[in-house]
Amino acid sequence: MCNQNCRGWYEGDPIMEEYHDHEWCKINHDDRFEFEMLCLEGASVGLSWKTIMHKREAYRKAFHYFDIDSCAAMTDQKLEKLLSDKGLIRNRSKILSVRKNAQVVKKIQAEFGSLDAYIWSFTDGKQIDGGWTVPEEIPTKSDISVKMSADMKKRGIAFAGVR
């Protein structure tokens, strides 16, 4: 569905345009990238994706560019310090969730071989193409997203719900 029909939600915003043209709808099998998206989605709860994308570089710097091992090892002191970082959403639960989620992701990697293998296990390794032509057609949840969300929650991933 990545086509000119999407332009309305990013036109005139270079950060959103870059995200749309180079990441949205693009398959990426990198665990670090997938962990970054998981964390940023968590940070976006109750906010717009645009807000988070405009804070993305601050998040990358604060959270070791989403290196999973580094995030899993972050100290309470370091996380507390981030609560005063104006570049981040200064919500205690959201900040602390990055470390917690990294620790859970490490367990997922041990079980599945990678975060990527875990994520793709919900679709039997196949990309889903809903045939949507405009953003308004894209559902906010599906049977697969509900199943994935429930499994992530069961494993201890924070902010992994469907809206």
What are these regions (language model features)?
Residues M1-R163:
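HhH-family (HhH-GPD) DNA N-glycosylase catalytic core used in base-excision repair
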